[in-house]
Amino acid sequence: MLEKEYSFALYDRVDQLPAAWDELAAANIFLSCGYLSVLETSAPQNMECHFIGVFDGSELVAAALSQFLDLNSLESFGERDRCIKTSVRNFVFKRFSSHVMFIGNNMLTGQNAFVSGKTADYSSVLFALKAASVTLASQYRKRGKPIHLVTFKDFSESKADRFKTAGFSDYFQFSTQPNMVLEIRPDWNSFDDYIASLLKKYRDQFKRARKKSDGLEKRKMHLEDILQHEKTINELYHHVARNAPFNTFFLAENHFRTLKEKLGGNFLFYGYFDDGKLVGFSTLIKNGDVLDTYFLGYDESVQREKMLYLNMLYDMIAFGINKGFREIVFARTALEIKSSVGAQPVEMIGFMKHRNRLINKKLDRVFDYLEPKTEWQQRHPFK
């Protein structure tokens, strides 16, 4: 039984949002007007974003993000792992799930679907968001773009019961790769303290990586630098993105520039140069006392020779410790190497529903085939 009955309103533009939106979204930069305006002006080409306000009477009690993805307009899901199973998976997505609606942010890992006020009832908010997703699906159907799959993504396992209360019994509960998170220990007052806390094997890994990176120059890049190197930045990003086993979007060319314009000092861009040439970059977003890693790119030959990716991880940790962050969110993928620097897996759950009733009943089998469990060995690098 729901405690409250909330209403909702849909918005297509940031300038339409209620005045109280940013006050509510202060707990999560990824739901702030600043970040949402980035999505409004530089979302991936196959993505449309909508914003949802949940109200108790006239009071805004929750602020949410919805994303529509059209997988038909994507040139490639990814160019790695060319095999029959991958081809079948890609066919199934295009044929049966090409129009996907997310309540949440498909570009991030973690609970970035909505933020709610302290007095808001969680299950009642979910119920209102479910109703909003039905209305959005109806709007897309009238536009000739029927929604095949609705997904509420990246919630902590402790919230599963709240979804049941909110009437998600016909949704399939799923989990994919965990979110890799490094908790900053209170006794790490400097990066040297972090290194000292590592077992010898992992201290040696750090020393080897730093030795390999000899000759690389790391630079903090400002807006004018990002603009100057934008072509190379996009090439480096696409090299990494297209070599991923599966993609549902590719970033817009102006995405990093727009992030810097809208978020200012909360968006950090670091370039890695070899003999004056940009060969890699990493990005970070400050989210209160949490440091979120964002997208990166690199030249594969330099990455192998210089252990560039591992060095980026160490640099992110050094920044997080030196600036007093509580934790660093390393997100999904590359689970083993992230665990080798101390990140711990945090299981996330989601809920999905297919518009075809027969397919919806079989989602558990379909999901296990299309999203096989990742086999990896967790590392334990600390003393």
Which positions does each model-derived feature cover?
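A conserved beta-strand-loop-helix scaffold within acyl/acetyltransferase catalytic domains
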Residues: 3-82, 148-304
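Active-site/acyl-donor-binding loops of N-acyltransferases
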Residues: 2-5, 68-69, 111, 166-193, ...
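Acyl-donor binding region in acyl/amide transferases
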Residues: 48, 71-170, 290-350
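Glycine-rich loops and low-complexity Gly/Arg-rich segments
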Residues: 32-35, 77-79, 87-92, 139-140, ...
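Short C-terminal domain-edge/linker segments immediately following a structured domain
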Residues: 39-42, 83-85, 93-99, 181-185, ...
